[in-house]
Structures are given as C-alpha cells and as structure tokens.
Amino acid sequence: MPVQAAQWTEFLSCPICYNEFDENVHKPISLGCSHTVCKTCLNKLHRKACPFDQTAINTDIDVLPVNFALLQLVGAQVPDHQSIKLSNLGENKHYEVAKKCVEDLALYLKPLSGGKGVASLNQSALSRPMQRKLVTLVNCQLVEEEGRVRAMRAARSLGERTVTELILQHQNPQQLSANLWAAVRARGCQFLGPAMQEEALKLVLLALEDGSALSRKVLVLFVVQRLEPRFPQASKTSIGHVVQLLYRASCFKVTKRDEDSSLMQLKEEFRSYEALRREHDAQIVHIAMEAGLRISPEQWSSLLYGDLAHKSHMQSIIDKLQSPESFAKSVQELTIVLQRTGDPANLNRLRPHLELLANIDPNPDAVSPTWEQLENAMVAVKTVVHGLVDFIQNYSRKGHETPQPQPNSKYKTSMCRDLRQQGGCPRGTNCTFAHSQEELEKYRLRNKKINATVRTFPLLNKVGVNNTVTTTAGNVISVIGSTETTGKIVPSTNGISNAENSVSQLISRSTDSTLRALETVKKVGKVGANGQNAAGPSADSVTENKIGSPPKTPVSNVAATSAGPSNVGTELNSVPQKSSPFLTRVPVYPPHSENIQYFQDPRTQIPFEVPQYPQTGYYPPPPTVPAGVAPCVPRFVRSNNVPESSLPPASMPYADHYSTFSPRDRMNSSPYQPPPPQPYGPVPPVPSGMYAPVYDSRRIWRPPMYQRDDIIRSNSLPPMDVMHSSVYQTSLRERYNSLDGYYSVACQPPSEPRTTVPLPREPCGHLKTSCEEQIRRKPDQWAQYHTQKAPLVSSTLPVATQSPTPPSPLFSVDFRADFSESVSGTKFEEDHLSHYSPWSCGTIGSCINAIDSEPKDVIANSNAVLMDLDSGDVKRRVHLFETQRRTKEEDPIIPFSDGPIISKWGAISRSSRTGYHTTDPVQATASQGSATKPISVSDYVPYVNAVDSRWSSYGNEATSSAHYVERDRFIVTDLSGHRKHSSTGDLLSLELQQAKSNSLLLQREANALAMQQKWNSLDEGRHLTLNLLSKEIELRNGELQSDYTEDATDTKPDRDIELELSALDTDEPDGQSEPIEEILDIQLGISSQNDQLLNGMAVENGHPVQQHQKEPPKQKKQSLGEDHVILEEQKTILPVTSCFSQPLPVSISNASCLPITTSVSAGNLILKTHVMSEDKNDFLKPVANGKMVNS
C-alpha cells in the first residue's frame, strides 16, 4: 500500500481516539466540515467546534444524525427509520432521499471494511480516485448548511471523474502515451524516461539548490557530464529539453544580462526534490491537458515513475489542474466518443445527469443549495456512478486491471545507486534498478531474448513471411517468399539447401547479423531448397516478369536449365519492387559485416565435397561427406591490399554463387525450338571447393575433358548477368576463378526480330539471357566508343555446344592456383565480373545471337582477343545501353556506398588497375582428334560474344587497361614491314555461308583439339610463341586465298561476319616483301632462344606495343620479366565482327605487367594486327573462307 493511503482509509475509525466506529459506543457523527468523530469523543469537547479545523458546530450534538453510511461499512445494522426530524416535512423528505443515495454509494466502499486501516482495493469496481471522492461525499453532514455545500461539490467532483473514467475506458493507452510525448516534444521539452529523468532533476537540484545562478549552457553541461557514465545517451540537446520543461514550469528566477546569456536561479520553493518533481510532473500533466489527452493516474504513475506507487500523487496534481470548464468539455468529449463507438452500454442516458452535475458551482463560497437541488444532485451522482460501474463490469474491454508498466530495455539492467551507496533503496521492489547480481543478470538475459526474437515483417508487393524464423547460432533459415511473384515458397532446412545437401551452412555469429541477413533476403528474394530447379522457362519467371521484378536466377548445384533430372537445388527469386521503374540492383546476400562468418579460400582443397547427384553419362561421381563430419565453410581470401569494405563478401557457400538471370531468359520468347535433352544428365558439382559454374539458360554445361593434379575445374568465367558486387566482389583471383565455366553472355530483348539461320546441327532453342542488367551498369564506359564505331554486321550464327552431339570442342582456360597472389591489391570494381567473355570456343557461340542485328564488338575465341575500337555509328549502339544510361542518370552517386562510383565523363575507376600482374599462362587445352591441322579464324566466327569488348575496347581506358593486359597480352612481331596494305577502305569480311559447312567445322575443331596433348608439354615461353604461331598460320591461309577478293563484301550485313584482322603500323605501311616464313621465325623465336620474347613487341589486349627503335629481329628479343606496358599511339586489333572507319587510340598505363601466355590450338584463332597509317586509308582486303587476300 502507498504510504499516504492510511490518511484516507482511516475514515472508518475515530481520528481522536482511534477506535473503529461501531453502532453502540463509537457511533460516527459527521460535522459540517466533513470531519467524522465518534459520539464519545464529540461529547468530551470543551467547545462546540471541530477539534481539527476549529469550525463551529451550529447544530446541537445530540441532534446531529449518526452516519449510517459509515456504519454499514463496518458491519453494523442500519435502522429503517432514524430519529432525526427536520423543521418541516418537505425538507425531511428531500433529506431522506439524499441520505439514501449516499448510503447506496457508500456500498462501493464495502471492500475497505476488512479491518481497521486495512484497504483491499482489488475487489472494488471503482478506481482509487473515485473511491477517494466517494469517501469525501460520505463524510458530508447533510443536516448542516456547510455540509450540504460540500456534498454538492463532492457530487460534482464524482460526476466529473466519472466522465473521465468513461473516456479512459474508450482510449488506447499505447496511442495515448505516444500522443503525450509528441505533445511534450512539440513544446520543446522532453521526458527521458523514469530513471534518467529522475537523475537529471537531481543533478539540476544539486547544481542550483544552494541558490547559485548559472547560465543554461553551464547547467546543461554539468548535468550531461555527470550523467554520461551511467547514461551514455545523454546529450546536451536532451538535457536542454529537460531544463526547458522546468523553465516552462516557472521553476527558475531568470536574471538577464546584456550581451550575455541569462542566469537561472532555482526558486526557493523548489529547492527540494519533492517540490521540484511535483512541479515538473504538473507541467507534463498540463501539457497533456492542453493537448486534450485524458490519462488516468495509474497511467501517469507508470509513465513518469515506471511503477504504480505514485497514482495518488498524480491524482492530486490532476485535481489541482482541473478547471470549472473542464467538466462540460469532458461531457462533450464523451458524447463524441459514444457516437464513434455506437454506445453499446447506452451511456447517453447519463448525459442529463452529467450536465446537471456540471452546472454545480465548485466555488467554496457558492450559495447554499436548496434541499431539492441537493436531492437532485445526489440522485444524479448515484445514477452516473452506477452507470460507470455497470459499464466497467459488463462492457469494458480491459476491465479494472492495473496497467502493467511497459517493458523497458533499461529496466533493472544496472545496479541501484542508492542501494550501493546508502545500503538501502527507498523505492524498494518498485525500483527500476537491480538490487542484486541475480536480478541484474536475469533482466539482462531477458532483454537479450527479447532482442533476439524475429518478428514477422511485411514484404514488398504483398510478400509475406510464411514461417516465423527462429534464429540459432548454427543456421539462418530463410522462409521469405511471395506467393504472388513466385510459384512456390519452400522453407530451407539448413539455411541454404536441403538437409541432405552437405553444402555448408551460413554460420551466424550473433542474432543481429542473423536479423540483418534475413532483412536483406527479405528485400531481395527468397532462398529455398526443395530439390527443384527451374527447367527452361517457368511460370514463376513469367509471373514475375509481369510485375517488373528484378532479374531472377535459378540457383542450383546443377545447370539451372538442365533438361536432366535434378534432385537438390536452391532457387533464388528476387522480390519485385513495384516502385522501381527499372531493374534494381540490390545485394543478394547480406552486406559485409564483421558479425558474419565467411568462407575460406575457394582455391584450397577442402575435406568435403558438394552433394552427390544422379550420375548419367561417363562422369565420375564426386565424393560425399562422411557421416558425422561437420561441413567446412571455405573463406575467400582477398588480396592483402584490397580494401575490405570495398569487397562485400559472398555469404553463401561456393556452390550457390551463381549469377541471377533475367526472367526474360526463361520465357518462351525464343524463336527457336526448345533445346534437346541433355545427353550427359545432371552435371556433377565441382568437388574442389571453388565456385560451381553458372549456366545460362541456353546451353548445357559439359565438364572439362581433362583433369589437373591439384584441382578439377569447371568451364566457368565470371557471370555476365546481374550478380551484384556484394555477392562476388572479391579479389582478382575470385573474379576470374579459373576462367572456365563462368562466361558472359550478351542479351537480346525477346521482342527483337532475328535474322539468323542456325546451322542444321545446332538446334538453337536457347533462351536468351537478358543483358539489360549489365547494359545499365556501364553507360559511360561505352560512351567514348559510341562516337567512333561504325555499324557492324551482326553474326547470329548459333553455337554448336547446345547440340546433343558431343563432338563440339571443349576449351578449358585456367589460371594457376596462385593467380591472385601475384596480383596487387587494387580494388576490383563490381561490374567487371559481368562483362567477361568466355575463352572457350565451344561455349562462347551461344552468346552470338544475343543482340540481334547489332554490331558485335569483339571476337574472343580460344583465349585470343580481337578488339573492335573503330566503329563510328552511334545510333546502332546507343539503344543497347539506353536502359543502363537512363538508370545511371537517375541514380546519384553515393561516394562511400558499396556500389560502383562512375564518372559521367567515363568509367575512370571501374576496371582493375595495372597493379594486377601475373606470370602465369592462360592455358587452353582440349583433347579431341589426333591430327593437327591449321584452322582459319573464320571457322570460329560463329562463336562471338556480343559483349567481348570488355576484353578489347576497354583497353584504351588509361586507368583500367591492365584489367585486360593481364589476360590479353601477347608478344607479337611487328608485321608492318612484311605486309602490303590495301589502298582502299574495304574491310576484310567473311561470309557466314562457309561457316555452315558442318563437316568442315567439325573436322577442323577435332584437329584443333588434337593439339592439346602436344602443347601441354610446352613450357611457358612456348605458350607465347605457339599462340603467335597460330596467328601466322592464319596469315598464311589468308595469303593462299588471294583470289577471293570481293564476294564477301556484297553479302547482307545480317548474314555475314566481317573479319577485320589488321596489323597496324605507323612506320612502314607498305612493306610486305619479306617471306612469311621469315616473319614466322622471327615471331616465334624458333631459330634462337626459346625463353626469349621475339620481337620485343608486347600486345596489350591484342594491341602491339609501340617499338621505339628498329633493330634486327634477333636484337628485339627481350625476356618475359622485362615486358613493360608502353603507351601505344594508334594501334588496335580489329574484331572479326567489326566494321570500322578509324582506329581508336589505346592508352595503357605504364606498369610492369607480365603477360599471360595463352596456349591455343593451331588455327584456333589467328590474331592479325595492323598499324593504321597516319592517313587512315590502309585496310586489308576481304577474306574468303578464312583465307587472307594480299594486294
């Protein structure tokens, strides 16, 4: 019980003799001043006046009636007829009615009669303020005039409180508290919480209780400095708002000073904590009343003190702040509330009685009421109190339950200072601080559990959470999905895949990171595992495409569009964002956080393998994880100098690092028939711990035909599509993680017409991968090339790798395991991974039909790069990147975000710096066939990637060229003196018709593949030279075809691929008198040292490095380690599919970069270089059937 409770519950006993009232000796007699004394003590008074307030007793003591309202509370019998007789019969009648009403109301105090001074409020239907007001009414003496005046005021007070109680019954306490603090803040004040507010007020009192005058700034700084150890959130702003609250309550005496801040001195009446706190609380209550808020004393006590022990304190404040007009306003307010709720309890019947009570004058000096007015008032108050009790018992939603204090994250999370310093706490069990170590730990643990709870959250576009996620330390279960956008929603069993899947789980170090992971997956899509994959176009992607969702990728350990069966897989579906006018690029996985445990180096051999798949064909099954062996999660090791923040980690196991495909990829928009069934069945996973390959929906993956000692690599390049940087923005090694398997594909909108004539052996039912994502990524990088590109002839010849016939060549290009260690730590920008072309001639061709009738910028077949820098038609290229450019213009650059920063004047830092160096060769190997036969580059014209200019034209970005130098550097001899240039502007072109000769192509492919066994044994220097050998063989083939000159130039642009292979030279444009054999010997260095470079001419991205001095061929040799990048003047390598008018100068940063040796089969791809003369009028003659024509 509150301390002050006994002051008003002792009305059942005599305040003089302290004896409980009874019906015999200690009969209660009420005086006109509302004090009730037993008759024995009253007879002992020396003078007829109240012993407490000395109010004169006008009526004879023997005439004063016994207060039977109080007697019935102590169990006495109330007589039916009392002996009191008033002056006239009319007054007696009104008196009896009024007395009866009071006695009836007193019955609501019956639970208080359990014993002397003992009150049990729990069984009462009335609130404590109502009980206190009712006790005041019961103690009124109706016989005396003053008593009747007091009774009228008590009746009015009861009626007013009844209205307030009824309004409170219709309010939402949570909404009420929010409105209260909003009103407080609107007045420049602030309440910091019960504990912190108390400490702040005590510190203000400590600073000013001695009468000192301080400026507001000094006072605030003092309080903040003292609060910071216990409340780190204390700030000058918040404490300033507390001081403003006291200032508004007129607690300070302000002294103004000229040209200086005013001094504040605490008024004398507020130099104690109780007085200061009461004025503080009264100011908050006053603000609430100004805002029209009705808050019960219980709520006030909970809000301001964090307990329920200050209800009486708050009620007294409320009562003092009540105005005579507030009653009438409350009645109107109640009427409005009842109209809104429909008034199920018919409370409108109380309105006349409430209005009668509101009209009573609350002034103590008011005129005495008549007996009729007294009767009417007593009847009215009895009616409204009965109505309130009836509503609480029958219609109240919350009943008469004490409101529980709202949970506070700081509740009992620190030790009580009073207990520590003084050995005891005056608040006792109501203290909001812990009083023992056990209590402290208990509430801290409870807060942690509350914070760890995952609540369901609404997703965009009606996406809901199907299951509540319980976060554990072992896994993250993502069950986020949308039945609207995805056909199926499957909960994951171990965070990523099925229970039988042995792929490691995503380990969360804390619940916070788990929540962030779930939040990120919520925004992006769903990760589920139900053993299903999207095979070809699915209804899911069609549905999602309708609502404009981001590209979505079937993520699986096998080929996503594999026609064969697949049992285990995961699917990542992006959640659509309807508000976005374009395809949004958001991190698929959680952002970089130190709370998330990532994976180790994927290059290292790990002791477990990915789950086993149904084996069909001749591929051996991968080993499985033994039972009981915990799966190990590899961690991706980044280069030492790469900023950690710039490389958001891939936070899923390596088998799930797939690119996301546009839903266009899987729609039935392809003009071709569906692909034939896969002859090999499901693809076994990569057992080495590296990334499993990403597959586009138009091809079937075939694993490599060879096996290395250290690792089995798949045919993969970094995916071109919409993989975000935070998914796969790791070191250079990880970006080009063994350039096999990942490959880039250009994309064509499904609606564009196609003019391709597929080969008979190549059923092109390939679904096109959308390139809108990577298109929108680099508008500015392409911008500088648009102005110089001529319209190119599109090659739409489909690839042969989708064919069910296996003889299609398989070229696997791989980097050594220590590739990333040899590179420097320059930050790798995100979009590089999405534009790299495959170097496998067997797989690249599937991309050739991506952009219909569009210029093909480059041919990158079998590790050789032919660069297109010289086309001038802007319009032909513009719409390819229109979406990207529009998106970038709308998307402002955020300097320190994880997204790329790209200047509107061009891609300055999007590519890797020249610091990435490697000495490792790029080895192309294949095993098929036994004979060796030179193959013209025309044989591989169909295998062209529409976005392979990533390997080419971007080389003329001075700051990003080394990105390609490290792959595409070739040592070639300056062919300028050994070739004759065409005097016309005709370009070399190749008819597409000759490429349709399937038997010839297959035979040449088989012969090319036969070179693997022979060339694998060559050392690193031989790889360089053999690469050039293949190029020279093509020169020789071109020379033999000199008779074919003009036929290919007449073909339609959509039907042929123009092969532009030019050796550019600015010094000797007219000398090709030396034999090709001599040039070949010079280039290959066969006549001399094998470990020396030949002509000293390094081709950067296929560009020959400028020779600054002319020496005999044998004097031009330089070692591999001395290869430096020299600025080129106007040297390019012209692509097969390019039709151009002028070269684009390439500026390569000066850095020491060792070339990557590419071992290519003879004739696989012939790299021809041509140095443009100053007048830019020398071009090569057309080529027929891969043979070069020399004029």
Curated annotation (Swiss-Prot):
Post-translational modification remark: Proteolytically cleaved after Arg-509 and Arg-585 by MALT1 in activated CD4(+) T cells; cleavage at Arg-509 and Arg-585 is critical for promoting RC3H1 degradation in response to T-cell receptor (TCR) stimulation, and hence is necessary for prolonging the stability of a set of mRNAs controlling Th17 cell differentiation.
Ranges for region HEPN-N: 91-170
Annotated stretches, region: ROQ: 171-325
Localization in the cell: Cytoplasm, P-body
Residue ranges of the region described as HEPN-C: 326-396
Tissue-specific expression: Expressed in spleen, testis, ovary and small intestine.
Entry protein name: Roquin-2
Organism per entry: Homo sapiens
